[in-house]
Protein backbone atom coordinates (compact mmCIF):
# COMPACT_ATOMS: atom_id res chain seq x y z
CA UNK A 1 0.00 0.00 0.00
CA UNK A 2 2.76 2.49 0.88
CA UNK A 3 4.53 1.97 -2.48
CA UNK A 4 1.28 2.83 -4.24
CA UNK A 5 1.03 6.03 -2.19
CA UNK A 6 4.62 6.99 -3.03
CA UNK A 7 4.22 6.37 -6.76
CA UNK A 8 0.97 8.33 -6.76
CA UNK A 9 2.63 11.20 -4.90
CA UNK A 10 5.49 11.27 -7.44
CA UNK A 11 3.21 11.59 -10.47
CA UNK A 12 3.33 15.02 -12.03
CA UNK A 13 6.74 15.89 -10.55
CA UNK A 14 9.63 16.91 -12.78
CA UNK A 15 12.13 14.16 -13.61
CA UNK A 16 15.14 13.91 -11.29
CA UNK A 17 18.04 16.02 -12.53
CA UNK A 18 21.55 15.38 -11.24
CA UNK A 19 23.44 18.57 -10.46
CA UNK A 20 26.42 19.67 -8.41
CA UNK A 21 28.29 22.82 -7.49
CA UNK A 22 31.76 23.45 -8.89
CA UNK A 23 34.15 25.45 -11.02
CA UNK A 24 32.98 25.07 -14.63
CA UNK A 25 35.80 23.75 -16.85
CA UNK A 26 36.89 24.40 -20.38
CA UNK A 27 38.44 21.46 -22.25
CA UNK A 28 41.67 20.11 -20.73
CA UNK A 29 40.63 21.02 -17.15
CA UNK A 30 41.15 24.75 -17.75
CA UNK A 31 39.24 27.43 -15.83
CA UNK A 32 36.98 30.13 -17.20
CA UNK A 33 38.83 33.11 -15.74
CA UNK A 34 36.83 36.06 -14.46
CA UNK A 35 36.69 39.41 -12.70
CA UNK A 36 34.81 39.66 -9.40
CA UNK A 37 33.09 42.87 -10.56
CA UNK A 38 31.63 41.18 -13.66
CA UNK A 39 28.38 39.24 -14.03
CA UNK A 40 29.99 37.05 -16.70
CA UNK A 41 30.15 33.94 -14.50
CA UNK A 42 26.46 34.11 -13.63
CA UNK A 43 25.64 34.35 -17.35
CA UNK A 44 28.04 31.52 -18.30
CA UNK A 45 26.72 29.24 -15.58
CA UNK A 46 23.06 29.86 -16.41
CA UNK A 47 23.75 29.28 -20.14
CA UNK A 48 25.10 25.86 -19.13
CA UNK A 49 22.07 24.95 -17.00
CA UNK A 50 23.17 26.09 -13.53
CA UNK A 51 20.96 28.17 -11.26
CA UNK A 52 23.64 30.84 -10.65
CA UNK A 53 27.35 31.55 -10.71
CA UNK A 54 29.99 33.92 -9.42
CA UNK A 55 33.71 34.61 -9.68
CA UNK A 56 35.72 32.77 -7.05
CA UNK A 57 39.30 31.61 -6.50
CA UNK A 58 40.38 28.06 -7.34
CA UNK A 59 43.76 27.00 -5.97
CA UNK A 60 46.13 26.30 -8.85
CA UNK A 61 43.87 28.02 -11.38
CA UNK A 62 43.42 31.57 -10.04
CA UNK A 63 40.15 33.43 -10.50
CA UNK A 64 37.54 31.09 -11.94
CA UNK A 65 33.79 30.83 -12.48
CA UNK A 66 31.97 28.79 -9.82
CA UNK A 67 28.47 27.48 -10.60
CA UNK A 68 25.62 26.35 -8.35
CA UNK A 69 23.49 23.37 -9.42
CA UNK A 70 25.46 22.72 -12.62
CA UNK A 71 24.18 19.67 -14.54
CA UNK A 72 26.42 16.60 -14.39
CA UNK A 73 26.82 16.64 -18.18
CA UNK A 74 28.82 19.91 -17.93
CA UNK A 75 32.48 19.50 -16.96
CA UNK A 76 33.94 20.91 -13.76
CA UNK A 77 37.59 21.38 -12.81
CA UNK A 78 39.09 18.16 -11.47
CA UNK A 79 40.82 18.84 -8.15
CA UNK A 80 44.56 18.17 -8.23
CA UNK A 81 44.88 18.35 -12.02
CA UNK A 82 46.40 21.34 -13.79
CA UNK A 83 45.17 22.88 -17.02
CA UNK A 84 46.92 20.93 -19.78
CA UNK A 85 46.45 22.59 -23.16
From Swiss-Prot:
Q: Which GO terms describe its cellular component?
A: extracellular region
Q: Which Pfam families match?
A: Toxin_3 (PF00537)
Q: Which InterPro entries match?
A: LCN-type_CS_alpha_beta_dom (IPR044062), Scorpion_toxin-like (IPR003614), Scorpion_toxin-like_sf (IPR036574), Scorpion_toxinL (IPR018218), Scorpion_toxinL/defensin (IPR002061)
Q: Which residues form the LCN-type CS-alpha/beta domain?
A: 20-84
Report whether Ribosomal protein shows up as a keyword of the record: no
Instruction: Detail the disulphide connectivity of this chain as listed in its UniProt entry.
Output: 30-83, 34-55, 41-65, 45-67
| The protein's role, per its UniProt record | Alpha toxins bind voltage-independently at site-3 of sodium channels (Nav) and inhibit the inactivation of the activated channels, thereby blocking neuronal transmission. This toxin is active only on insects.
Q: In which tissues is it expressed?
A: Expressed by the venom gland.
Per UniProt, subcellular location reads as: Secreted
Q: Which residues form the signal peptide?
A: 1-18
Q: Please identify the protein, giving its name as recorded.
A: Alpha-insect toxin Bot14
GO BP annotations listed? defense response
* Family of the protein in this entry: Belongs to the long (4 C-C) scorpion toxin superfamily. Sodium channel inhibitor family. Alpha subfamily.
Q: Drop me one GO molecular function for this one.
A: sodium channel inhibitor activity
Q: Which UniProt keywords apply?
A: Disulfide bond, Ion channel impairing toxin, Neurotoxin, Secreted, Signal, Toxin, Voltage-gated sodium channel impairing toxin
User: How does the record comment on the protein's domains?
Assistant: Has the structural arrangement of an alpha-helix connected to antiparallel beta-sheets by disulfide bonds (CS-alpha/beta).
Q: Which PROSITE patterns match?
A: LCN_CSAB
Amino acid sequence: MSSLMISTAMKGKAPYRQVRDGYIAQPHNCAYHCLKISSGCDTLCKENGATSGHCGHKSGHGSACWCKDLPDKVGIIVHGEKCHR
